[in-house]
Amino acid sequence: LAEVDPALFVALGLNREGESPWCGRLDLGGGNTVGPKRIASLRTMHQAAQRMLKAAKASDKVDAAAWLERSIAFWQAVVLVLSEQWAAPRQHMLCKGIGVYALMSLAGHLVHEAGERPVTVDYFLAKLSDFLDQIDWTNHGPLEGFGGSKGADMALKMILEVRKDIYTRLSQHA
């Protein structure tokens, strides 16, 4: 599976591995919760992992186990930075499709930025702690109404703009 579909390997691993914040949390199907009460499904995470690999400009020959480790580290950092939002998934877009798609794309961007540096929880914390909590992740925040891949692209663009604005302000005061 790791060689045939690395993104599915990552999605399944996020739901299976004990150190993953997603362990046992992905909707594996069978239920019919819809709308803002729904949390991410395995299918959503699979597609989000595909977005991450694309954003990272990963080669065709992907080390799926390494990408699973990076994904777990990323989500561990997200949970530390956005602990209140993570603890209340039904009130926040963080654990729903649009949030998962946008954040996994962001993970890909950050991995690409890292280059040869180690990609660890500390790396992601350093990158995320300056700006991620400045975004309103509530169901009625700026991500409300975003849907599908275009919505995910728009959400990612908004996240990257918030990040750029924060870094611009920080550099002006340095």
Residue spans for each PLM region:
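Accessory terminal alpha-helical modules
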Residues: 1-174
